[in-house]
Amino acid sequence: MAQFVQVLAEIGDFGRFQIQLLILLCVLNFLSPFYFFAHVFMVLDEPHHCAVAWVKNHTFNLSAAEQLVLSVPLDTAGHPEPCLMFRPPPANASLQDILSHRFNETQPCDMGWEYPENRLPSLKNEFNLVCDRKHLKDTTQSVFMAGLLVGTLMFGPLCDRIGRKATILAQLLLFTLIGLATAFVPSFELYMALRFAVATAVAGLSFSNVTLLTEWVGPSWRTQAVVLAQCNFSLGQMVLAGLAYGFRNWRLLQITGTAPGLLLFFYFWALPESARWLLTRGRMDEAIQLIQKAASVNRRKLSPELMNQLVPEKTGPSGNALDLFRHPQLRKVTLIIFCVWFVDSLGYYGLSLQVGDFGLDVYLTQLIFGAVEVPARCSSIFMMQRFGRKWSQLGTLVLGGLMCIIIIFIPADLPVVVTMLAVVGKMATAAAFTISYVYSAELFPTILRQTGMGLVGIFSRIGGILTPLVILLGEYHAALPMLIYGSLPIVAGLLCTLLPETHGQGLKDTLQDLELGPHPRSPKSVPSEKETEAKGRTSSPGVAFVSSTYF
């Protein structure tokens, strides 16, 4: 009998077929940042003040500036108050009465708001996301993050049920059509509902494409392939800065960012299914046909005897979530990893969503944020090889946290310094996220790896949901968000000292293996592909690419 791992060895770990697949999936990762972060550029701050309709309704021969003086008080800086207006005088009051009696009692705006005349439509000025509605711009991001959580829970099982290709195509169609529909919404409530819907598709996409990639790429290239795919997410952030700069009209920006999905209709024919998934479903003929195509593209010859001995893949034994808490050592690992993923998400999205709050041009800052993620993600591979998983995870978390803490003490009139610190923090959190995928998968035993990675993914999404709400705390004190983004990663990083090192160790298969302690393995005796595949096999996106602690 032959298993798929043996066939993959003959096809090649990373040939032309896998490179073509990587490119197809990189395009999807490249498009994803628009859905995550474009909203930030649609709600940028802009001058506004209460509408002065009552003045205009009088037949006063006043200039616009004089009308403003009569209707809107000034703040301490001498600018019109954005959320207050003078209480209107009686309808029959004359201009002399108004000037002599000085109607100067204030009240919240009740006649709408006015914005600069040359403004372009934005979510903020079209739906009046100001004053008592200001919180909605951050609440919308929490709704989006909640959609990511639902999408992860929904499309994960669906990916195993109907296949990787079908799931990816369905998600591509969903987030493209919903994204285009978002550009034509008549109300902000409908906009929020569609943001939730598109988030479910985007979350499922990140799950499905990593799964498909890791099931076709061999052990020696899996980690590098996944990191390369993640780097395209960073490149997408850089392009988003240019798009947002060029299209200030939020509806045009929404259409421009989502329409490219329509050009990917050829994925229906170009994207391959996972041969391993076909084998687990007993669809032998389709799997063999796909394997032969992969071998042909890679210019490799398949042994007829090996193909004749190919048998359906069998799913190994699995545990349940409660098993993660029954074993003392595993319970400690699980709780700490929950904390790590929670703060990974909190810090990463916290800095990303506050890209306009560091003092420099928001478009330039977004470009820099995307650019620094590429070396950050790539360098994480070398850090894990040089310093091990534990110390790399600890170092990146603490570094990211310290940058956020230091920002609190930097004066606002030094925007370059603040932005530089934020950039270093963004690099550290991006690297920490990448390390978490590898380290977490190696810490869980094989029978619980899929369950464990699924649960840490949930905690990551919870961190994302809370991130915009943490930003709202800045209304009470400007330092609170950065204090939280800084202190929690430092605490989580210090907790990593309690975790075991996994670099150079054999992967654990069962709970009993945890009792045996570490099993060091010489780098020269890297495990066979069959062994590593058996130990790393899973359908979880954070798991399948970890088949050995050497890469």
Curated annotation (Swiss-Prot):
Bilayer-spanning residue ranges: 21-41, 139-159, 168-188, 196-216, 225-245, 252-272, 333-353, 355-375, 398-418, 428-448, 453-473, 479-499
Record-annotated disulphide pairs: none
Keywords, alphabetical: Cell membrane, Glycoprotein, Membrane, Transmembrane, Transmembrane helix
Glycosylation sites: 57, 61, 92, 104
Compartments, as annotated in UniProt: Apical cell membrane
pH dependence: Optimum pH is 6.4 for urate transport. Optimum pH is 5.0 for p-aminohippurate transport.
Listed GO MF terms: nicotinate transmembrane transporter activity; urate transmembrane transporter activity
One Pfam match: Sugar_tr
Positions on the Extracellular side per record topology: 42-138, 189-195, 246-251, 354, 419-427, 474-478
Topology, Cytoplasmic side: 1-20, 160-167, 217-224, 273-332, 376-397, 449-452, 500-551
Record's comment on post-translational modification: Glycosylated.
Function: Anion antiporter that mediates the transport of urate, orotate and nicotinate in exchange for organic or inorganic anions. Translocates urate and orotate across the apical membrane of proximal tubule epithelial cells and involved in urate renal reabsorption. Possibly involved in orotate renal reabsorption and nicotinate intestinal reabsorption. Mediates urate uptake by an exchange with organic anions such as (S)-lactate, succinate, glutathione and nicotinate. Urate and orotate transports are Cl(-)-dependent.
Family per record: Belongs to the major facilitator (TC 2.A.1) superfamily. Organic cation transporter (TC 2.A.1.19) family.
Protein name per the record: Solute carrier family 22 member 13
Species assigned in the record: Homo sapiens (Human)
Lineage, opening ranks: Eukaryota, Metazoa, Chordata, Craniata, Vertebrata
